[in-house]
């Protein structure tokens, strides 16, 4: 086990009473540069307990701590304890662990097989899959991979928006201006054009809105014509969506859209009634949340039709009963914060103790060059266009720089789509993103292609070496600052995965694999690898193999391929 941070916490635990091992572990920091040690422990939080100045506490601990052979020294500076590892021992332990664990390096059984439901993507049927949907899809997909890697049993759910008043609008538009042959030829774009036309015409003729509501009511009452059109629109849209999911290498365990819960809503209404949680307000049924500083949660309209909140409550109850989840995560943008807070509170008021286990994983919105993406106005950037454009762009670069690369169509696909996904996941999820073609296709700096190219570079070195890589190395060759920086970033990787899971933040992994790539490229530039000295060569090749392995795992956890050649 190469977890030197754990070893530091164990040394501290022998001298510090009243603080648990886990808390000590979380207090340990990695200094910004190696002159300040490899691990640092701030004594400021101990000042109140020990009734001494942090500097004094640090001095006393330095005098008491008995170092093992894993460490060269410990000193104190300004209230910090600074631990310096034995570089030889450290390098060998890290490299051995990575090479022995292979593609399972960083994997842990934290979840012990417990079920985690992750609700992500969830586009609307009969509307296009635009770049605004990308964030939920790729964040959810990455969280699925991270939780799975840490021993949870993940259930990926696509809660399709396949029910609602928009279908009434599309039916009205189709009956007034639609062409069946056009829809069969190009379903998504034709349905979008009809949806946009409906809103344009409704501004001039508001009666169309009433007509649309009427068609949706027919759907809810089981009208044969309305349901037949709805099923047709839905099946055509889902076929197109699955093509895009295949491009993104995203999968779901369940496609259960809003319509799946049509027969489960009355039970929710009845239960709310029995618990005296429902109040009538202007003919509609609400749950009053004024006591919790929230507007009322509307669960049933005046005409008896249900709303998103009702369906979400029904879905959550169904998921708990079906999957008995440890957690249920909902990956949607922050504009829905209030909606989730409201119905989460309703679940709690209904007496379900698992209300604490459902969580909204919110993220910032995507705008297109400063404007919000809205399908009703037609101002959308279709995701399929972006992905295909990225693949074409990479194909051009390959033809220019390396036209003889094997499987160049597949490489172009892996790198082009990887660039788009990486661009999204390199940002903290809560940040708004302004989508622009130039940014999405930029391959300079901290980008997906940069990390993928680093993986391909490491793969190339290993192919040229034509030797079996082993962890039986002389680690004395790996103790210089540049090489140690590579090894440190590798050693931190397992904790980075855990941090990403705890915070539900894939960008933590994305940023770290950029750090690994940068550290490796400095190592590659400064240190010839295929040298005459066999012992030195094998030690450096072991570092190359470890980097390749960790980059491959890291890219996989964010849903990106790791090409062997580029």
From Swiss-Prot:
It is found in: Cytoplasm. Keywords: Aminoacyl-tRNA synthetase, ATP-binding, Cytoplasm, Ligase, Nucleotide-binding, Protein biosynthesis. A motif ('HIGH' region) lies at residues 123-133. GO terms for molecular function: arginine-tRNA ligase activity; ATP binding. Pfam families: Arg_tRNA_synt_N, DALR_1, tRNA-synt_1d. GO terms for biological process: arginyl-tRNA aminoacylation. InterPro entries: aa-tRNA-synth_I_CS (IPR001412), Arg-tRNA-ligase (IPR001278), Arg-tRNA-synth_N (IPR005148), Arg-tRNA-synth_N_sf (IPR036695), ArgRS_core (IPR035684), DALR_anticod-bd (IPR008909), Rossmann-like_a/b/a_fold (IPR014729), tRNAsynth_Ia_anticodon-bd (IPR009080). GO terms for cellular component: cytoplasm. Monomer. This is Arginine--tRNA ligase. It comes from Alkaliphilus metalliredigens (strain QYMF).
């Amino acid at each position: 086990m190469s977890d030197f941070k754990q070893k530091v916490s164990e040394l501290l635990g022998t001298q510090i009473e009243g603080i648990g091992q886990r808390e000590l572990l979380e207090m340990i920091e990695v200094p910004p540069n190696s002159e300040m040690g490899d691990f640092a422990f701030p004594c400021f939080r101990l000042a109140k307990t020990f009734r001494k100045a942090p500097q004094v506490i640090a001095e006393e601990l330095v005098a008491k701590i008995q170092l093992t052979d894993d460490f060269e020294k410990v000193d104190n500076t300004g209230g910090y304890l600074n631990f310096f590892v034995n570089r030889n021992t450290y390098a060998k332990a890290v490299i051995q662990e990575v090479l022995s664990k292979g593609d399972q390096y960083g994997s842990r059984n934290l979840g012990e097989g417990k079920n985690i439901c992750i609700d992500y993507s969830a586009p609307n049927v009969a509307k296009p899959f635009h770049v605004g949907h990308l964030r939920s899809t790729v964040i959810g997909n990455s969280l699925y991979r991270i939780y799975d890697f840490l021993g949870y049993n993940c259930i990926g759910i696509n809660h399709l928006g396949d029910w609602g008043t928009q279908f009434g609008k599309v039916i009205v538009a189709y009956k007034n201006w639609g062409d069946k042959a056009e829809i069969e030829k190009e379903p998504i774009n034709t349905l979008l054009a009809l949806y946009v036309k409906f809103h344009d015409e409704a501004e001039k003729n508001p009666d169309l809105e009433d007509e649309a509501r009427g068609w949706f009511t027919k759907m809810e009452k089981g009208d044969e014509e309305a349901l037949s059109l709805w099923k047709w629109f839905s099946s055509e849209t889902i076929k197109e969506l699955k093509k895009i999911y295949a491009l993104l290498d995203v999968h779901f365990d369940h496609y259960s859209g809003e319509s799946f819960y049509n027969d489960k809503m009355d039970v929710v209404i009845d239960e709310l009634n029995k618990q005296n949680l429902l109040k009538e307000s202007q003919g509609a049924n609400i749950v009053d949340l004024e006591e919790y500083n929230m507007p009322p949660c509307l669960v049933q309209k005046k005409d008896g039709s249900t709303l998103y909140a009702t369906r979400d409550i029904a879905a959550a109850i169904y998921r708990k009963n079906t999957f008995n989840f440890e957690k249920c995560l909902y990956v949607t943008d922050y504009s829905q914060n209030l909606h989730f807070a409201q119905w989460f509170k309703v679940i709690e008021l209904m007496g379900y103790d698992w209300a604490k286990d459902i969580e909204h994983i919110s993220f910032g919105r995507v705008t297109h060059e400063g404007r919000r993406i809205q399908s009703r106005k037609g101002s959308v950037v279709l995701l399929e266009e972006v992905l295909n454009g990225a693949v074409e762009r990479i194909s051009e670069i390959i033809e220019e720089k390396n036209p003889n690369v094997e499987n160049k169509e597949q490489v172009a696909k892996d790198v082009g789509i990887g660039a788009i996904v990486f661009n999204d996941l390199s940002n903290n999820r809560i940040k708004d993103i302004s989508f622009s073609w130039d940014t999405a296709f930029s391959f300079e700096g901290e980008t997906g292609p940069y990390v993928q190219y680093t993986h391909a570079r490491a793969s190339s070195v290993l192919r040229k070496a034509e030797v079996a890589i082993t962890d039986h190395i002389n680690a004395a060759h790996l103790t210089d600052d540049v090489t140690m920086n590579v090894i440190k970033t590798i050693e931190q990787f397992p904790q980075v995965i855990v941090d990403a899971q705890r915070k539900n933040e894939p960008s933590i992994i994305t940023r770290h694999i950029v750090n690994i790539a940068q550290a490796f490229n400095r190592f590659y530039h400064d240190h010839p690898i295929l040298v005459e000295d066999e012992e030195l060569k094998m030690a450096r090749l072991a570092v190359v193999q470890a980097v390749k392995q960790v980059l491959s795992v890291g890219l996989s956890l964010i849903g990106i391929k790791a090409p062997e050649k580029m």
